[in-house]
Design a protein with these regions (language model features):
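Hydrophobic alpha-helical membrane segments
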Residues: 1-227
Length: 227
């Protein structure tokens, strides 16, 4: 899964307030040429609506491919090119390999959190109430930590599509760049999660805006942190 010709990339440290700047850049990119992104986002939401009840593992898979396509769109928009399905970005085998890896990682997350939750439920049934409550908090903390760990993969799709690097290296660089820039990363992760939650209140229609804004923010962050 490694590319044969991989460029040398350096991880840069961004100022603490850059997380907000990346989100602002994502909003600016969306405003510049929002129609294809809205269509792409609506198409993804329809696919998720059709397949989520039967195969939830497709959610992170399709989300990863979506991030890669939007990264290609951002590059094309900056160059004034016409966007046609990411000019084949969705056919990139490395992007799909990355998506499968992320999907398997997400499945492992669900299994881990589910096992912890089952343990907490059993302890809550057969132990004192305060022990059950403590395990519930442990379950919530574990879920939060695993979500943050998966969130460090947010830069990988742009690296695979735009930098033409291998899947394993892209994952490593994404995690390393996120950990080297914890405050900007957490800013995007927390505000992004809030944006997605608020968007769902409008029957999910707000996701047509929130999703591309966050994807463009990820592409902007990848361009800045890894050069």
């Amino acid at each position: 899964m490694q590319a044969s010709d991989t460029p040398t990339l350096t991880i840069h440290q961004a100022p603490h307030g850059r997380g907000l700047a990346w989100l602002a850049a994502g909003w600016s990119m969306f405003q510049r040429r929002w129609q294809p992104l809205a269509v792409l986002s609506a198409g993804l939401l329809i696919l998720l609506w059709l397949f989520i009840p039967r195969a939830s593992i497709l959610v992170p898979v399709l989300a990863t491919v979506y991030l890669g396509i939007v990264a290609a769109w951002c590059r094309m928009a900056r160059g004034g090119e016409v966007f046609l399905a990411g000019s084949g970005a969705w056919k990139n085998p490395a992007l799909w390999a990355l998506a499968i890896v992320v999907g398997l990682a997400s499945l492992a997350q669900l299994m881990l959190v589910g096992a912890i939750g089952a343990g907490a439920a059993m302890q809550g049934m057969y132990s004192a109430a305060h022990i059950g409550k403590g395990l519930f908090y442990a379950f919530a903390a574990a879920q939060l930590l695993v979500w943050l760990a998966l969130s460090t993969l947010w830069l990988a799709p742009a690296l695979v599509v735009e930098r033409k690097i291998g899947v394993v290296r892209a994952l490593g660089l994404s995690v390393a760049a996120s950990l080297r820039n914890p405050l900007p990363f957490l800013t995007v992760a927390v505000l992004g999660a809030l944006m997605l939650l608020l968007s769902m209140l409008l029957l999910g229609l707000g996701l047509i805006v929130a999703m591309p804004v966050l994807a463009c923010a990820a592409a902007s962050a990848a361009d800045e942190l890894l050069a």
